[in-house]
Amino acid sequence: MLRRLSLREKGEEMDVLKISSKSNPNSVAGAIAGLVKETQRAEMQAIGAGALNQAIKAVAIARGFVAPSGVDLICVPAFAEVQIEGEDRTGIRLIVESRK
């Protein structure tokens, strides 16, 4: 499952891809490649080991999608505090940016 969540950060509208353990890495990779081509940046949020595994695989696949055009991807991990059904959870936010 792949869901987009719109956030406002630093005065800009930003899409955050919410990744689950059931997310298809190829679909997520396509979304990452599209966002990076469009905005030079993509953000993902994963909660749990399975979701993080799918997110990392997606970054590797997306890198293969954009590499032929001379774009390299870098990935910066960060912790994210998320509220789910009133309960605080710690997740991982992956910020993917292009590097030429």
Language-model-detected regions and their locations in the chain:
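Short, Lys/Arg-enriched N-terminal segments with co-localized hydrophobic residues
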Residues: 1-13
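Short, hydrophobic/π-rich interface segment
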Residues: 49-75
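An N-terminal amphipathic alpha-helical segment
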Residues: 14-40
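Short glycine-rich, basic-tinged beta-strand/loop micro-motifs
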Residues: 36-53
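Short, low-complexity, polar/charged sequence segments that are solvent-exposed and flexible
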Residues: 36-40, 62-66, 93-96
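C-terminal edge-of-domain segments
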Residues: 67-100
